[in-house]
């Protein structure tokens, strides 16, 4: 009898740990969980659980086969628990699972790209920007239907640290495949240096604007601008990508003007009040007295630099009356828009930032008086008992242009 045990084959000796990505469960929609167990032989074996399997099971399997093949996976057991995920989500989750296994590096599995919208104008209207968690694909598809001026696919605070890598791929694929209608397509990257890795995946898909969080010094803006330029050069892209810096600390506020002038690509400054008040060690209130200095610093720096000043989000999504008061005050201070955490906030913000009937009527009278004086060759323009100087005329022109852009007047 042979005293030596049988020799195991190489494939029997090697064990590969499983890798996962995505979510499933009764409260999950438009997502899936993927579990991949690599093996040395046997091809691709897919076990699929889905409520829509009778209708889309074969197409899901074909897509999984294609994605895995492009990523170089030839032999694996793949377990998919689907909760109604769209193809771009399925592809992103599979790619994330493969990358978490340490494979597929350098390979980007890209879904078919929809036609890019017209490039965003530097001075376009930015009254509202709706934040959408980058790890929650269920919010992507309908995000544009609520009428915000911009949709922010967020990779920062709304994404758990363990999901940053997977969210990056979801957002990348969403930029390629989701029609965001007339919304400006924005992405909030992570705080540097992690945010630079976000740009490597995001920039090739041509977002309109990148929000840079927790900016404290101009060098951070310049680092983002440099990485964007490098990626655009690598992919031969010429489409503009604008920047919006978020100031969220006492240091950032004190450096507001230098940050606003750090790059020609910056179109707006905004403020993050949750982090700012935490930095001060004070409680954020609905009146905002504790942050008035910071907001005015942002306003003054933005206007001095010739860019837009955008206010923070209003955190209490259930108190619409308080939101209305905040937004009205925000416009009165000189802000041109603010952030939104929930779609119900959008119409209230738009209403607050729209010129009122009285403002429009007064602007018309000012412009009429100015035009009449010009026709008569008069150097002095007056309306009633008040003199009208060039700044007043310019303000009236801007108000009427804004009213026309908002559809308030023809």
Where are these regions (language model features)?
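N-terminal intrinsically disordered, cationic/polar leader segments
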Residues: 1-121
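Expand to "…catalyze enediolate/carbanion chemistry for C-C bond making/breaking, isomerization
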Residues: 91-96, 100-410
């Amino acid at each position: 009898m042979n005293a030596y045990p049988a020799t195991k084959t190489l494939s029997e000796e090697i064990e590969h740990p499983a890798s996962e990505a995505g979510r499933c469960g009764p409260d999950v929609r438009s997502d899936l969980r993927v579990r991949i167990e690599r093996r040395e032989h046997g091809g691709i074996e897919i076990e699929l659980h889905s409520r829509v399997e009778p209708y889309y099971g074969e197409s899901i399997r074909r897509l999984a086969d294609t994605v895995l093949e492009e990523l170089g996976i030839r032999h694996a057991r793949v377990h998919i628990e689907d909760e109604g995920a769209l193809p771009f989500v399925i592809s992103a989750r599979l790619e994330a699972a493969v990358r978490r296994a340490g494979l597929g590096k350098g390979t980007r599995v890209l879904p078919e790209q929809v036609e890019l919208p017209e490039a965003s104008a530097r001075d376009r209207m930015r009254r509202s920007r709706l934040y959408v968690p980058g790890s929650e694909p269920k919010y992507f598809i309908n995000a544009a239907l609520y009428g915000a001026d911009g949709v922010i696919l967020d990779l920062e605070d709304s994404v758990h640290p363990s999901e940053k890598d997977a969210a990056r791929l979801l957002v990348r694929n969403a930029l390629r495949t989701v029609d965001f209608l007339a919304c400006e397509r924005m992405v909030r990257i992570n705080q540097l240096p992690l945010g630079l890795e976000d740009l490597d995946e995001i920039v090739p898909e041509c977002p309109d604007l990148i929000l840079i969080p927790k900016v404290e010094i101009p060098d951070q803006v310049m680092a983002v601008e440099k990485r964007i330029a490098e990626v655009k050069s690598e992919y031969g892209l010429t489409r503009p990508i604008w920047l919006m810096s978020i100031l969220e600390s006492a240091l950032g506020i004190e450096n507001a003007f230098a940050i606003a002038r750090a790059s020609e690509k910056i179109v707006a400054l905004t403020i993050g009040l949750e982090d700012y008040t935490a930095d001060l060690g004070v409680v954020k209130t609905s009146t905002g007295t504790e942050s008035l200095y910071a907001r005015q610093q942002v306003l003054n720096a933005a206007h001095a630099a010739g860019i837009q000043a955008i206010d923070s989000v209003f955190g209490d999504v259930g108190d619409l009356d308080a939101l209305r008061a905040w937004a009205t005050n925000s416009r009165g201070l000189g802000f041109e828009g603010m952030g939104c955490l929930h779609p119900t906030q959008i119409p209230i913000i738009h209403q607050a930032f729209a010129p009122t009937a009285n403002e429009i009527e007064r602007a018309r009278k000012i412009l009429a008086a100015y035009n009449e004086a010009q026709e008569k060759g008069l150097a002095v323009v007056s309306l009633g008992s008040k003199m009208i100087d060039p700044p007043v005329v310019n303000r009236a022109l801007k108000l009427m242009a804004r009213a026309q852009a908002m559809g308030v007047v023809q």
